[in-house]
From Swiss-Prot:
Disulfide bonds: none annotated. [4Fe-4S] cluster binds at residues 60, 64, 67. Gene3D superfamilies: 1.10.10.920, Aldolase class I. It comes from Cereibacter sphaeroides (strain ATCC 17023 / DSM 158 / JCM 6121 / CCUG 31486 / LMG 2827 / NBRC 12203 / NCIMB 8253 / ATH 2.4.1.). This is Oxygen-independent coproporphyrinogen III oxidase. Its cofactor is [4Fe-4S] cluster. Residues 45-282 form the Radical SAM core domain. Involved in the heme and chlorophyll biosynthesis. Catalyzes the anaerobic oxidative decarboxylation of propionate groups of rings A and B of coproporphyrinogen III to yield the vinyl groups in protoporphyrinogen IX. CDD domains: Radical_SAM (cd01335). GO terms for molecular function: 4 iron, 4 sulfur cluster binding; coproporphyrinogen dehydrogenase activity; coproporphyrinogen oxidase activity; metal ion binding. Pathway: Porphyrin-containing compound metabolism; protoporphyrin-IX biosynthesis; protoporphyrinogen-IX from coproporphyrinogen-III (AdoMet route): step 1/1. GO terms for biological process: bacteriochlorophyll biosynthetic process; porphyrin-containing compound biosynthetic process; protoporphyrinogen IX biosynthetic process. Keywords: 4Fe-4S, Bacteriochlorophyll biosynthesis, Chlorophyll biosynthesis, Cytoplasm, Iron, Iron-sulfur, Metal-binding, Oxidoreductase, Porphyrin biosynthesis, S-adenosyl-L-methionine. The gene is hemZ.
Length: 450
């Protein structure tokens, strides 16, 4: 790795940079995109095409203090049932606007805690989805499972619904750290769940672990990673904890004095990364790892890796429909986002309309910049030939962008015969480099019009 001091001067430890799971990022969406435009974009999906679905369940039995996701606590099933009824109505709205023959290629249930849905609601939602968008034979159906909020009946219902992949949030197995973030989930409980899933024939197991949590040390992270690897997940994501109490007030419960500093965070990530690579996983992008033969590793090797709202993916569908409060949809034309408030979302759906609250219509420049950012984060390079073949950008203008970026990141970025490349030792700066192509982020010194 390039000298840490050099990377630090370029912003490694103090820059606040988007994850770029979309471009533009969601904070840059505007209110000018309406439910009518959302409906029109759905109607424009060609007959016989394929789409992906994301179903958002915002409810949790407990609110983990570290989490900044759009969630709300409930001890009753009543709001969950009302929400599920609205999801079925939203699916009916979708079905009414889809062209004949549109198929479901991929589906993900996230939250929140999707597994707090009772078995009957899991069955009902699966049937409503099947009625709205018939599945392909090879449809990949993934679900986020909380090991503390699952039982045999709900697992039965999910497998009967066609679940093929499970994502488990581990965070850290140290009891002290779990107590400090409001998420107690023992290794033994997680182990029993993974063994049950494998016994039932689960095709893919994903796991997330966090670094930068309070009280974390390199030896402690090593212990948690080794325990996680003993469960043989197919994919592992090593994600940085973002302490943003101004955005997520529940994080005020976490004592800031116990949170590792920037240099310590880098050491924690490198500790986890080294152990995972030693265990035979392949690194995919910045922070994902996959076993050889896993579709994600294959997509990475073939240059087909993409960014999505779940991170790195091999999903090639151009259209992603988000269902539920705050869910985001992606179309070739742009992005739409449902009302973040559950009550506002339910009110709109019950009145027979989508709850679209904001979004963004993509310009040609957005598409170009979005693709360059995606290439940097997926492949750590921008292919000159691919960009020129796909977009109407003058070669000399593209070279100007490359030179400006390379000058801003000396010793980290270089111009090659193939295009622009982030050197291996500079890859921790990939998101910061990508930000230099973001015309909506003033702190990233946006480039001029293309």
């Amino acid at each position: 790795m390039a000298a840490v001091s050099h990377l630090a001067k370029l912003g490694l430890f103090d820059a606040r940079v988007p994850r770029y799971t979309s471009y533009p990022t969601a904070p840059n969406f505007g209110v000018g995109v309406t439910e009518n435009l959302h409906a029109d974009w759905i109607s424009s999906i060609p007959a016989g095409g394929s789409i992906s679905l994301y179903l958002h369940v915002p409810f949790c039995r407990r609110l983990c203090w570290f989490c900044a996701c759009r969630t709300q606590g409930t001890s009753s099933d009543a709001p969950v049932r009302a929400y599920a009824a609205a999801l079925k109505s939203e699916l009916a709205l979708l079905r009414a606007r889809l062209a004949p023959g549109v198929r479901l290629a991929r589906m993900h249930w996230g939250g929140g805690t999707p597994t707090l849905l009772p078995p009957t609601l899991i069955h009902e939602l699966a049937l409503a989805i099947r009625d709205a968008v018939p599945s392909d034979a090879e449809t990949d159906f993934s679900v986020e499972i909380d090991p503390t909020e699952i039982d045999a009946a709900r697992l039965d219902a999910l497998f009967e619904a066609g679940m093929t992949r499970v994502s488990i949030g581990v965070q850290d197995f140290d009891p002290l750290i779990q107590q400090s973030i409001g998420r107690e989930q023992s290794f033994e409980l997680t182990q029993r769940l993974t063994e049950d899933l494998r016994h039932r024939g689960l095709m893919g197991l994903d796991a997330d672990i966090l670094y930068g949590l309070p009280h974390q040390t390199a030896p402690g992270v090593a212990d948690s990673v080794q325990k996680l690897l003993s469960l043989s997940p197919d994919r592992v994501a090593v994600l940085g904890y973002a302490h943003v109490p101004a955005v997520s007030r529940r994080q005020l419960m976490i004592p800031t004095a116990s949170i590792p500093g920037p240099e310590e965070r880098l050491d924690l990530f490198e500790t986890a990364r080294t152990l995972i690579l030693w265990d035979g996983y392949q690194q995919v992008g910045l922070d994902h790892f996959a076993r050889a033969g896993d579709p994600l590793a294959h997509a990475h090797a073939c240059g087909r890796l993409c960014r999505s709202f779940q991170g790195y993916t091999d999903d090639r569908a151009e259209v992603l429909i988000g269902l539920g409060a705050s869910a985001i949809s992606r179309f070739p034309q742009g992005f739409t986002q449902n009302a973040p408030s559950t009550s506002d979302h339910l009110r709109a759906i019950r009145s027979g309309r989508f709850s679209t609250a904001r979004g963004h219509v993509l310009s040609d420049e957005d598409r170009l910049r979005g693709r360059m950012i995606e290439q940097l984060l997926c492949e750590f390079r921008i292919s000159r030939a691919q960009i020129l073949a796909r977009f109407a950008v003058a070669p000399e203008r593209l070279e100007t962008l490359f030179r400006t970026c390379a000058a801003a990141f000396p010793g980290v970025v270089e111009i090659t015969g193939h295009g622009l490349e982030i050197l291996e030792e500079g890859r921790p700066l990939a998101r910061i480099v990508a930000r230099s192509f973001d015309r909506y982020d003033a702190s990233g010194k946006p480039q001029g019009a293309i």
